[in-house]
Amino acid sequence: MGDSAEVAVAHRRGISSLLLGRAARTVLARASGQSVALSRFWPGRTDRLLIAPNDLRTVDATRASEIYAGRFVFAGKIVTSHGRSIFELDPPSEDWEASLLGFGWLRHLRAADSAITRANARSLIDDWISKPIRKGGTGWRADVLARRVISLLSQAPLVLNDADGKFYRRFLRSLTREIRYLRYTMVDIPDGVPRLQVLIALCYASLCLANQAKHIRSSSRKLSEELTRQLLPDGGHLSRNP
């Protein structure tokens, strides 16, 4: 990592530390402590990704080969694409569809990081980006959209390594559009965990994307307030839902 990239990462972390309350700092520090600087990708662009937060969830590199073979196993259901776009097939359940469209499975591809898995990740994301935009349904549910934004930001090093400029621009346009939609629908998001997920996604976006920097202060404040409101003194959620 070059000196300028290290400065950019440190600056972003410093901003988040200054603006966030203790609860919010804990959440973001865990994810950004091992963040990856992305400034080396197309330096100088004002719409570029600066850092990628660390994904702390468990990974299984063997699942990358299943996905490459077109087998998508989520929520106890298996769908095989047989060469078709997985996004065009009928989902076997809403939970399966939510897992697919949350893009959390990208972390398994990153665990098996290779030229093949990177190309596979880009191909699948391109499939999603190329779909006609029809807002509504599971893919545009607040909690699913928030998970997708977080996953795409976290797995940007996998997706953008070896990518050409055209894919980079498509990826960023789509990501920015989804972030904008999250901000627009914020007032309608139900209370509880979904609202918290959306605020975390928006805070990540403001810290990771150069074109979202103007939202750092408001996103950080809203996340800090929501964490203070929803988290109990013992660290549990007020719903007591594990």
Role assignments for model-derived ranges:
Residues 3-10, 14, 88, 92, ...:
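A near-ubiquitous, low-amplitude feature marking generic local secondary-structure context
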Residues 94-242:
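Aromatic-lined, polymer-binding surfaces characteristic
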Residues 72, 87, 237:
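Short clusters of hydrophobic/aromatic residues that line enzyme substrate/ligand-binding pockets
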Residues 37-63, 77-111, 191-208:
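Long, acidic, intrinsically disordered low-complexity segments
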Residues 1-82:
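Extreme N-terminal leader/anchor segments
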